[in-house]
């Protein structure tokens, strides 16, 4: 925790002078036949050099701007030396919905978005150069996508994540994606993170997840931790006072980014310099100065 606080200190001390750029981009999804907006935060050190990428997913009712509204991502990207990508996930839970062909966000986050980013930014285009995390619905989505696409992501996290959806069958429009739990119990079982994690083996993914004691998702996160312990799967599980809110998530993100930074340092190829990586397809560049 002390090191996380140091990251916060140095990041926000540099916020006024942060040179990271934020691009707003439109990414074409072939599977959904539409464009999906996203924010791309490129640290100053990323100009002309390949860098790892953190995909950062929002929660239910949020959008691609949620994380930037919670905390300024530019100094964090600069301090941790990684590109940060925040896609819009609507209220999809980041599944490929078996009921709604217009909601195929697992394919988007796992395949279409990384391919688009790799083609336009100077990334490290392999699982060793990609991590994914998110808050609430996005925490579920990050673990869901990473568990099912370990060839695409080497590290994953969740903060206040809905890692077991089954205790909440009437909440957050999940019925629109999966149908009623009582009519589709096997579908709900198959679409929850804690069940997906049951086959995970130690070393297949670097994992970090956290939850506040006062969060309604605390128990399901504790259950996931205990399951992984029984399976012998190494992971970082952090708990501390806090509820399901922006104050908790803004404090959690630096800790998770430190975890990913360390993992990238051990696993990603050295970031070599290349020609300038101009971002094609950018339709609006934002200046998020505060």
Regions found by a protein language model. Name each.
Residues 4-13:
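Sec-dependent N-terminal signal peptides
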Residues 19-290:
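Non-catalytic cap/lid and distal C-terminal segments of serine-dependent acyl enzymes
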């Amino acid at each position: 925790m002390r090191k996380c606080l140091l990251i916060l200190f140095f990041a926000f001390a540099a916020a006024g002078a942060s040179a990271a750029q934020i691009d707003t981009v439109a990414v074409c999804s072939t599977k959904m036949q539409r464009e999906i907006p996203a924010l791309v935060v490129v640290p100053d050190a990323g100009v002309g050099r390949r860098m790892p990428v953190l995909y950062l997913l929002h929660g239910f009712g949020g959008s691609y701007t949620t994380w930037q509204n919670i905390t300024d991502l530019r100094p964090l990207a600069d301090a941790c030396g990684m590109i940060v990508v925040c896609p819009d996930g609507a209220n999809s839970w980041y599944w490929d919905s078996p009921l709604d062909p217009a909601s195929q966000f697992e394919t988007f986050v796992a395949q279409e978005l990384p391919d688009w980013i790799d083609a336009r930014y100077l990334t490290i285009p392999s699982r060793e150069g990609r991590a994914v995390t998110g808050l609430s619905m996005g925490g579920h989505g990050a673990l869901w996508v990473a568990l099912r696409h370990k060839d695409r992501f080497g590290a994953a996290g969740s903060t206040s994540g809905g890692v077991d959806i089954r205790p909440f069958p009437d909440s957050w429009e999940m019925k629109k994606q999966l149908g009623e739990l009582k009519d589709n119990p096997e579908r709900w079982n198959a679409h929850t993170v804690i069940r997906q994690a049951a086959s995970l083996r130690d070393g297949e993914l670097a994992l970090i997840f956290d939850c506040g004691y006062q969060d309604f998702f605390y128990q399901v996160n504790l259950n996931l931790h205990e399951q992984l312990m029984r399976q012998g799967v190494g992971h970082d599980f952090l708990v501390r006072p806090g509820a399901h809110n922006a104050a908790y998530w803004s404090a959690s993100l630096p800790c998770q980014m430190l975890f990913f930074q360390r993992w990238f340092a051990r696993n990603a190829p050295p970031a070599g310099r290349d020609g300038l990586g101009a971002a094609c397809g950018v339709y609006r560049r934002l200046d998020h100065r505060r």
